[in-house]
Amino acid sequence: IAKKHNILYLVDGAQSAGVYDIDVEDMNIDMLAFPGHKGLLGPQGTGGLYIREGLELTEIFQGGTGSISHSLIQPDVLPDKFESGTPNGPGIAGLGAGVKYILELGIENIRKKEEELTWHFIEEASKIEGIKLYGTLEKGSHAPVVALNVKDADSSEISYILDEKYDIAVRPGLHCAPLAHKTIGTFEQGVV
């Protein structure tokens, strides 16, 4: 539909890169944005943007690239066009190591294990009084991410308790999606 109306198709791969096989050509993806620190097992501050061949975008930053240092404007060649400043060499190496590890394990094996663990968690958490799970709770219907609340408790407080008492790391809050939280009624409380 998007292609028919000359609309670019940008996919947010935050929860899928490293867990699901993403074929940008088969899926007709124009751009795929992904963080390196989640499913790709790289360090924070890494990530990438796939841009379909032939797609012309305007850079948003201007600055030295080291590749055409004499120029006062951003180079018009890829990837330099979108990479102002000094590259994060250690971060890129760490991201490369994460991707190598994923390829060794096999993305299908990772996906199956994460889905198995997610479904087990959903089944067990559903049995606990006061826990509210959000989203579609059907097996195989979503990425291996679970959002929940415990009664009316603040999500940050629940996160703190899980960390301090049980050594369980979670991320509380609005998860960079305030409008989604307004839609499901969790804007004030956030979710765990």
Task: Name the predicted role of every residue range.
Residues I1-V192:
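Pyridoxal 5′-phosphate
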